[in-house]
Design a protein with these regions (language model features):
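Post-signal peptide N-terminal segment of secreted/secretory-pathway proteins
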Residues: 51-155
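Beta-propeller blade signature
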Residues: 52-57, 100-102, 143-154, 201-220, ...
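Beta-propeller fold detector
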Residues: 61-74, 109-119, 155-171, 220-229, ...
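Repeated scaffold domains used in trafficking and secretory/extracellular systems
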Residues: 71-84, 116-129, 168-179, 231-241, ...
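Intrinsically disordered, low-complexity segments enriched in Gly and acidic/Ser/Thr residues
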Residues: 279-375
Length: 406
């Protein structure tokens, strides 16, 4: 996913005008590089353009270029999700109509399936065979709109509203950081925001975490669970939940709540747990990441299996509500351990790292996009067992913004 943390106005596109869907008549294959990996790349020396879509057959060696390859998308900001063996590319329209373009891979090449007119949402996740999308208000008193998109039919099959203003019970409104399917329910962690008063994303309640639990597919609110040991879960447009093979759900807090533009949480960046089959925080589990890492806070993570997460982190000096950390480490939530990854480029040479990365979920491996300040871009293979990073595929012509596989 493109680095949404650098600009809080970034959001994802939602399918709104299904009647305006247009099928690609020729269903032409559009990528010259065969392979089931999909890399999105923002071209160098270009402004106001969206990512190129490139395919590759491996991430560990070779060179891939935007020159004469891939698909140039329209629009500016794009966000991505893969589910049901399809790749969804979603345009954020910035006040104009957006689009959702759907692809699959045939014989190692991207093939366009459909294109939909859109509007803007701020949280989304695969649930069963659907994409669940939620448009979240930033003004107190307004309701959130949800949409269920059937990923076989590429149709909206159900929609409704959520009363986010009454979730908090404290006079502020709830803003979901993300959505996650947990068994047959949808967990929606949220932060409490004023949504007014020249402090829209500020809060008077910085030291609590909440998760709204919804039935699926009815989206009926079942309960709200709360934990006062951390600040809110995840961050704006960042998935702060990870579900293990045994069904346990882990949650990270960055501790980046603000009041009046100033960090106000007294809680450290930490990890908590909701045990499988329950809808309560486990008060016997708490992992103080800030202490374990020598004072850093988690900004993103990706679950790779076996209790291991690859995490991005920032130091206290680098801390920001929308900053993506360039310090890479391995967290094992079972053992409550943190190991810094070696082999990454020097920190002062890194321009950006991708938020949306790929893992085969083998308990060991993740692939992360890194773009250096000199403009060169590479995929790095992260080995959780050895806590090392190895430079792999070189990408010429732009900044890597996401890595996926179909």
């Amino acid at each position: 996913m493109k680095s949404t943390l650098k600009n809080a106005c970034y959001a994802m596109a939602l399918i709104a005008g299904i009647s305006s869907c247009s099928k690609d008549k020729s269903n032409d294959l559009i990528s010259e590089n065969k392979g089931n990996y999909i890399l999105t790349v923002t071209p160098v020396a270009s402004t106001g353009v969206a990512d190129y879509l490139l395919t590759a057959d491996n991430l560990e060696s070779g060179t891939l270029s935007t020159a004469g390859n891939g698909l140039e998308q329209d629009g500016t900001f794009r966000y991505y999700v893969t589910t049901n063996n399809k790749f969804f590319s979603m345009l954020y329209g910035q006040g104009n109509p957006g689009a959702v373009t759907t692809y699959n891979i045939q014989n190692g090449k991207l093939s366009k399936l459909s294109n939909f007119q859109t509007e803007t949402v701020q949280a989304f996740a695969p649930v069963n065979n659907d994409l669940l999308l939620v448009k979240i208000p930033r003004t107190y008193g307004n309701k959130a709109n949800w949409y269920q998109v059937d990923t076989d039919k590429l149709l909206i099959t159900s929609e409704g509203q959520l009363d986010v203003a009454n979730l908090t019970g404290n006079g502020e409104t709830a803003h979901f950081s993300w959505l996650k399917q947990v068994n047959n329910k949808v967990f929606a962690p949220y932060f409490s925001i004023k949504a007014c008063c020249a402090d829209g994303f500020g809060t008077n309640y910085p030291d609590s975490a909440w998760v709204a639990v919804y039935d699926y597919p009815s989206m009926k609110l079942e309960k709200i669970i709360k934990d006062n040991r951390t600040s809110f879960i995840g961050r704006y447009f960042v998935d702060g939940l990870g579900v293990l093979e045994n069904g346990d759900t882990y949650a990270f807090s960055s501790s980046v709540a603000t009041t009046g533009g100033v960090f106000s949480s007294k809680k450290p960046s930490a990890i908590t747990r909701i045990n499988a089959g329950t809808t309560e925080f486990d008060q016997n589990y708490y992992f103080n990441f800030q202490d374990a890492s020598g004072g850093m806070n988690i900004t993103n993570w990706i679950y790779i299996g076996g209790g291991n997460f690859v995490v991005n982190a920032t130091t206290a000096a680098e801390k920001g509500a929308y900053n993506t950390g360039v310090h890479i480490g391995i967290v094992n939530v079972n053992n409550k351990t943190f190991k810094a990854v070696t082999g990454m480029p020097d920190l002062d040479k890194i321009g950006s790292v991708t938020d949306h990365n790929f893992t085969p979920k083998d308990g060991r491996t993740a692939y992360m996009g890194v773009t250096l300040k000199d403009g060169s871009s590479f995929v790095y293979k992260i080995d959780a067992v050895t806590a090392t990073a190895t430079q792999g595929l070189k990408v010429e012509g732009g900044t890597i913004t996401s890595i996926s596989k179909l």
